[in-house]
């Protein structure tokens, strides 16, 4: 299973942000700047930007375009480090659904807004990746088919049976869950293989 956004999409985006007062307004403005990534193990905070940003930068590898790169220690910390000026810009994630000024409908920016630790008017969006498949909700393969069916039915019913619980689990506004298989994640698998070999 995977989550379905309020608009019916089943993905999210890597989003590059900078301070509103930085003067930067587009991704090419990061030339010669300090770029922060969320975490080396993050799909949206590192993997996808590393693989897809060169297209937006005229074919240049990120490391050859910016002055330096570093890691923020997670998505929330990365955004805080951008606000502090440790990085001129940084990559995090959001649903891309709704308005940037609200932190979108879900994702790190929305969670930070909901916690009261981020005012979106302090940031500007410089870049948004291609759609990234939402993460999976998986069941071990050696569990009986009957148990798998019960677990699947429970999660598919959760948005209507206990909307507050569903929202707390997923961290934002989602429509529900949908069935997917490993082929849905092929772009991520291929991107990971391209960066580590295999």
Describe these PLM feature segments.
Residues 108, 139-198:
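An extracytoplasmic/periplasmic, membrane-proximal ligand-sensing/linker region
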